[in-house]
């Protein structure tokens, strides 16, 4: 029921962001490296050890400081200042390629599925910082993430009210239009809201940089997001971030056991590091985010869910193969794994890069 991907070469050029700041005026200079490093540490909770230390040493003052932050972070001035810094300090290396044969219709509702997970999916995070939430053909998006992520510093400033949890109940409420953010979008812009999810979740994050020539998609037994799309009658925008798995090295010990536990607990079990054990500073920021023609989930019925899931995985692999060489990853293959389907035993014994 799915045609092969027929990508075009339509790159997103530098453009003014939602803050009115023209990105073309900001060089990707080494002078901005300290700011970029600070942003990486901020988005990956690099402040957590200091926060714990402060709570132990001066708990009252620390709690007061946290309360002050959350009371001001919704102010327009605060968000504008923080987003200005994020735009200025975001790397220019990640790029976006439109591989869809025609632009998405912003008047239609979709479900966007971003692959792979990586370490908090820097490719999309970076592009949202630079271009705003609606850079994908004007489609109005809301990020659906782990429940605690929306409370992280920097995330609220980027996404404003366009971030929520990734539970089925919440995604259904967005697709059916009765989520508060969906109501606001319909009232202010007369456009539907598209939930953006990362189907692999924390389990897939555990497989970041697991193998130098294999990218693992942890979705062999994950059908929930496809079921949501079928029930709502919407198609799925397929997106892949090439290079995302090369940003960090991750702990190999008991990888599949930890991935299964991450799925059961709903908590991350991945431990990562950058070059020279510098933690949140990445090995590379050369990431290419590619979006493809929508997967026609609306053409399936719930009785066809297993077939839709199988077709989706085949379509995702076709999309991956169609662009991997252009994006500098022609040597890689995509392998689907899951709770009951661990990686190929021989592959897991192969040498791992930087691990």
Where are the regions a protein language model picked out?
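Non-catalytic C-terminal accessory region of glycerolipid acyltransferases
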Residues: 2-17, 21, 176-177, 181-355
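Alpha-helical bilayer-embedded segments of polytopic membrane proteins, i.e.
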Residues: 25-68
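Extended, polar/charged low-complexity intrinsically disordered and coiled-coil segments in eukaryotic
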Residues: 55-72, 77-78, 276-278, 325-328, ...
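Catalytic core of membrane glycerolipid acyltransferases/transacylases, capturing the structured
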Residues: 62-78, 89, 106-187, 201-220, ...
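N-terminal topogenic membrane-targeting module
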Residues: 77-99
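A residue-level signal for beta-strand positions that form part of recognition/binding surfaces
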Residues: 93, 109, 140, 194, ...
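Cytochrome P450 fold signature focused on the C-terminal beta-domain
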Residues: 93-94, 166-172, 326-333
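A short acidic-Thr-Gly-centered motif at the start of a beta-strand
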Residues: 100-104
């Amino acid at each position: 029921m799915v045609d092969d991907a027929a990508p075009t070469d339509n790159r997103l050029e530098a453009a003014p962001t939602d803050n009115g700041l023209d990105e073309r005026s900001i060089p990707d200079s080494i002078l901005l490296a300290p700011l970029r490093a600070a942003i990486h540490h901020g988005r990956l909770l690099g402040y957590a050890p200091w926060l714990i230390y402060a709570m132990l040493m001066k708990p009252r003052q620390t709690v007061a400081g946290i309360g002050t932050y959350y009371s001001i972070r919704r102010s327009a001035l605060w968000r504008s200042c923080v987003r200005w810094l994020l735009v200025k300090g975001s790397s220019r290396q990640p790029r976006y390629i439109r591989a869809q044969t025609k632009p998405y219709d912003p008047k239609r509702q979709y479900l966007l599925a971003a692959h792979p997970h990586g370490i908090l999916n820097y490719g999309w995070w970076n592009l949202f910082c630079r271009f705003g939430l609606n850079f994908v053909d004007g489609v109005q998006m809301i990020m659906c993430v782990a429940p605690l992520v929306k409370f992280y510093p920097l995330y609220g400033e980027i996404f404003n009210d366009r971030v929520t949890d990734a539970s089925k109940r919440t995604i259904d409420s967005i697709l059916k239009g009765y989520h508060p953010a969906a109501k606001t979008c319909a009232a202010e812009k007369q456009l539907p809201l598209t939930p953006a999810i990362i189907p692999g979740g924390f389990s897939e994050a555990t497989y970041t940089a697991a193998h130098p020539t294999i990218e693992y998609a942890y979705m062999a037994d994950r059908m929930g997001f496809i079921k949501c799309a079928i029930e709502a009658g919407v198609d799925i925008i397929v997106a892949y971030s090439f290079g995302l798995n090369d940003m960090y090295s991750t702990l190999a010990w008991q990888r599949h056991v930890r991935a299964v536990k991450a799925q059961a607990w709903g908590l991350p079990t991945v431990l990562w590091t950058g070059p020279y054990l510098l933690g949140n500073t990445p090995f590379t920021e050369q990431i290419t985010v590619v979006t493809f023609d929508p997967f026609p989930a609306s053409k399936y019925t719930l009785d066809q869910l297993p077939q839709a899931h199988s077709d989706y995985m085949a379509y995702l692999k076709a999309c991956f193969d169609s662009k991997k060489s252009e994006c500098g990853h022609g040597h890689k293959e995509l392998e689907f794994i899951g709770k009951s389907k661990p990686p190929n035993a021989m592959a897991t014994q192969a040498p791992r890069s930087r691990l």
